[in-house]
Amino acid sequence: DAVRWAKSDLELFAPTVELHRLIRENSKDETEYKRFVDSLKASVLTAFYTPKEITDTIADVLADYSVRPARMLEPSAGVGVFVDSMLRHSPNADVMAFEKDLLTGTILRHLYPDQKMRTCGFEKIERPFNNYFDLAVSNIPFGDIAVFDAEFQRSDSFGRRSAQKTIHNYFFLKGLDAVRDGGIVAFITSQGVLNSTKTSVRNELFSQANLVSAIRLPNNLFTDNA
């Protein structure tokens, strides 16, 4: 009901109604429709989708340095813009991608039916995929969102245990776990990873990997894709 909407949000009313119509028409029943909607609501704070120009540029730079992975990981895939950009240069790559939002994950699976597209959180990745991938690339979620990981919780490293408190720190360390020795982690993330006054996670990162490059992007770069 548009009457209940704030005047500043009214321009979003019609697209929202259309989205609900499409979800309802493509859900097998009311229960599935509600699951899709609830999943969308749960992802609102972390769903910042990446402009294609950014993913293409990162893929091009990696290719210029002869980074053409046979095994690629995308831990927060959205609808697969990074997957698409990377497959232009490495069409035969085996890709494993994670997308926690139910609706977005369903779209992702339909777009890439021949790849391993998983509709669940990155924390669900299994131990056999440690030291497995040549490249992990993503615009990872960020913020003070906790992630529980039993392996991290049992770790002797304070940095690994504390990384569970902020999702971007967790994704970095979990991504490093997943790539092989000599592999590359290429993530877009918030300033908190480098700027935080707490150093335990950074120390853990630098104990496991060498920093190849870090580029600061404008803080409004993803506003139109939020």
Regions found by a protein language model. Give the residues of each.
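Conserved proline-anchored active-site loop of SAM-dependent methyltransferases
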Residues: 56-88, 97, 108, 120-155, ...
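Conserved Class I SAM-dependent methyltransferase catalytic core
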Residues: 58, 100-102, 163-221
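Class I S-adenosyl-L-methionine
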Residues: 1-111, 115
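Short loop/edge segments at beta-strand edges and connector loops
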Residues: 118-122, 215-216
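Glycine-rich phosphate-binding "P-loop"
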Residues: 45-46, 156-164
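Glycine-rich, phosphate-binding/catalytic loops in enzymes
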Residues: 90, 114-115, 152-156, 202-205
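Flexible, glycine-/basic-rich loop-and-beta segments that form/coincide
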Residues: 223-226
